[in-house]
Amino acid sequence: TTPVIQFNSVRKIVKTSSDGLGGKIKIDSVIMSVDFQDGDGDLGLTVAQIKANPKYKDFSNFIVDVLIQKNGKFVPVTFSPRLGGLVNFPFLPNQKPGPIEGTIDYSTPFVYAFYKGYSPLFTEKNDTLKFQIKIVDNAFNVSNTVETAPIIIFQD
């Protein structure tokens, strides 16, 4: 069956890390949480499943599109590679197929030193972003798309 998701929350963790050259760099990590349901529980793959089946070679089951506010409107930002990827959904305890539901978190870091290089749409500070999220089950059924609340990164 096709998975269904709902927006749960979006939050930011601000931290400073070493740049490896004796300096410090600022990192804003954005954590997006979505609630999910899937009637047959075929979300998430084991390493063995990925290795055994070539159709999962470049499989992404958590897809994130980024929007930035410009002149009062949100416009898409192209990331290469795209945000998201292969997320480990919690497996059913008995490994038998069946309905599954829960909450999954996805975190992506924005490193201040490289931030403007991600996209020409980005500015130095105080960009307002939103994220559109969808998930894909192991049969390649694509969920509905949810949108996060806006969040400001590299805020003064």
Region annotations inferred by a language model:
Residues 1-18, 23-156:
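Non-catalytic macromolecular-recognition regions in eukaryotic signaling proteins
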